[in-house]
C-alpha cells in the first residue's frame, strides 16, 4: 500500500529520457504539479535575497577568487593567489564556485548561486527517490521536508561544501535504488561515481553511506541456496561500484601525490605535506577525535591566532615536517608567528562540535533546532516501512529501508560521539 492509495493523484507517465526535446521535457514536468511545488519552494528559500550573505565563508571565498584567475591554483585547490597552500578540503565544491565566478565575475550570486541550485536539485531528487517506491504524495512530503529543513536552507545559501555533499548523497541513494530495482551493474557504477564525487567534496564523510548500502545490497540479493559461487554475481556488481568510487574519489588525491612538492601548494591541515595525511588525519580520524577542529566558521588566522569566527585547530600544526613550497632548506616563512600555521582552515568556533558527546547530542540546543527535531518522524517512518515491507528479501522496498535506516544509524552514531 502506498500513500497514493489514500490520497490519489492523477496517473501520468514516469519521467524518462525517451524524448529528449525541451518541449517534451517541460510537458512531463508539468504533469507532476507537486514536483513543481517542491522546486518552487526550494528555489524561493535558496535564492531569495541571496546577496545578503555577502561572501559567506570568507576563507572559501578568497580561495575561489584565487582559483578563478589562475588555472594552476584551480587545479591544486590553492587558497591564495601565490599558490602557497591548499584549502583544507578536496576541490570539487571550490571548482564549481570558481567556474561560476570566472564566468559571471566575483559577486555574491556567482559565489553562492551554485549551492542554491544544488539545494533545488537535491529536493527534486529526493521527491523522485521516494516517489518511485511509495508514491507521489510521499515524494512530495519528502521533498518539502528536505528543502525546508533550516540547516539545509542555510547551507544552500552558503559557500561551504556541505550542500554539494548533500546533493551527491541523495543522488547516490537515487542511483542505488535504481540498482535495487533493475539489478543492473551500471547503476551500481553510478552509485560509486556519486559517492566518489562526494569524497572529492568532503573526503571520508561521504563514505558513511557505504555500510548501509552494502548491507541492503546483500540482503536483497543473497540467496543461501546458491552457495558462495552462486552469489558471486551480485558481489561482483558491488565490486564494480567500489572500483568506480575509487577511481573517481582518488583522482585528485593521486594527482597531488604524484606532483612534486615544489610544483604545488603545501597541503593544508598536514605536518608532512602529504595528501594521505589530510585524508586519514585532518579530514579523517581527526574529525572523530576532535584534533581537526569543528566544521564551519570563518577563515583561520596565521600564527595560531584565531581566524574569523574563531577558527579551531590549525591549518596544519607544526611545519617541521618539511619545507613549504617556494622556501628552501626547510625554512618556515611563518616562524615569526610562533612557527605554526594556525587557526583552522574554515574551522568552527570551538573544538567541540555541537556540544558534549552522548546519545542525545543530536537533540541538544545546538543541533536539535537544525535537524534533530526530524529524528522522531524518521523513527516513525522507519517503523512504518518495517511493517510495510516485513523485511522481505528480493524486495527493493526492503533494500531502500535498510539503506536509509542504516545510513541514519551510522551518521547518528558518528555525529553523536565525534569529539
Show where each model-derived region lies.
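Membrane-integral, polyisoprenol-dependent glycosyltransferases
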Residues: 1-292, 302-419
Amino acid at each position: 500500500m502506498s500513500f497514493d492509495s489514500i490520497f490519489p493523484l492523477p496517473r501520468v507517465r514516469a519521467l524518462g529520457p525517451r524524448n529528449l526535446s525541451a518541449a517534451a521535457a517541460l510537458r512531463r514536468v508539468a504533469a507532476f504539479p507537486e514536483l513543481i511545488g517542491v522546486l518552487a519552494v526550494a528555489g524561493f528559500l535558496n535564492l531569495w535575497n541571496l546577496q545578503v550573505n555577502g561572501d559567506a565563508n570568507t576563507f572559501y571565498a578568497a580561495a575561489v577568487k584565487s582559483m578563478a584567475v589562475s588555472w594552476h591554483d584551480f587545479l591544486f585547490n590553492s587558497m591564495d593567489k601565490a599558490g602557497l597552500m591548499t584549502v583544507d578540503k578536496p576541490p570539487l565544491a571550490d571548482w564549481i564556485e570558481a567556474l561560476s565566478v570566472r564566468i559571471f565575475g566575483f559577486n555574491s550570486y556567482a559565489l553562492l548561486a551554485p549551492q542554491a541550485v544544488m539545494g533545488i536539485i537535491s529536493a527534486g531528487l529526493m521527491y523522485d527517490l521516494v516517489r518511485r517506491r511509495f508514491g507521489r504524495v510521499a515524494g512530495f512530503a519528502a521533498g518539502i521536508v528536505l528543502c525546508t529543513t533550516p540547516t539545509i536552507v542555510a547551507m544552500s545559501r552558503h559557500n561551504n561544501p556541505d550542500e554539494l555533499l548533500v546533493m551527491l548523497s541523495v543522488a547516490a541513494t537515487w542511483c542505488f535504488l535504481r540498482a535495487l530495482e533493475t539489478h543492473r551493474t551500471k547503476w551500481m557504477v553510478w552509485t560509486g561515481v556519486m559517492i566518489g564525487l562526494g569524497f572529492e567534496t568532503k573526503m571520508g564523510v561521504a563514505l558513511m553511506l557505504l555500510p548501509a548500502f552494502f548491507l541492503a545490497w546483500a540482503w536483497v540479493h543473497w540467496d543461501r541456496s546458491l552457495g558462495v559461487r552462486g552469489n558471486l554475481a551480485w558481489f561482483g556488481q558491488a565490486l564494480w561500484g567500489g572500483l568506480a568510487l575509487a577511481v573517481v574519489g582518488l583522482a585528485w588525491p593521486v594527482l597531488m601525490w604524484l606532483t612534486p612538492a615544489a610544483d604545488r601548494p603545501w597541503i593544508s591541515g598536514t605536518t608532512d605535506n602529504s595528501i594521505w595525511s589530510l585524508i586519514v588525519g585532518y579530514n579523517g580520524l581527526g574529525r572523530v577525535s576532535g584534533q581537526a577542529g569543528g566544521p564551519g566558521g570563518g577563515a583561520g588566522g596565521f600564527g595560531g591566532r584565531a581566524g574569523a569566527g574563531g577558527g579551531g585547530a590549525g591549518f596544519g600544526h607544526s611545519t617541521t615536517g618539511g619545507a613549504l613550497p617556494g622556501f628552501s632548506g626547510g625554512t618556515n616563512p611563518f616562524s615569526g608567528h610562533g612557527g605554526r600555521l594556525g587557526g583552522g582552515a574554515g574551522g568552527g568556533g570551538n573544538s567541540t562540535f555541537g556540544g558534549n558527546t552522548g546519545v542525545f547530542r543530536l537533540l541538544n540546543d545546538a543541533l536539535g533546532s537544525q535537524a534533530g527535531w526530524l529524528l522522531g518522524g524518521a523513527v516513525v517512518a522507519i517503523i512504518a516501512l518495517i511493517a510495510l515491507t516485513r523485511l522481505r528479501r528480493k524486495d527493493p522496498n526492503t533494500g531502500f529501508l535498510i539503506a536509509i535506516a542504516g545510513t541514519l544509524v551510522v551518521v547518528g552514531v558518528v555525529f553523536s560521539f565525534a569529539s
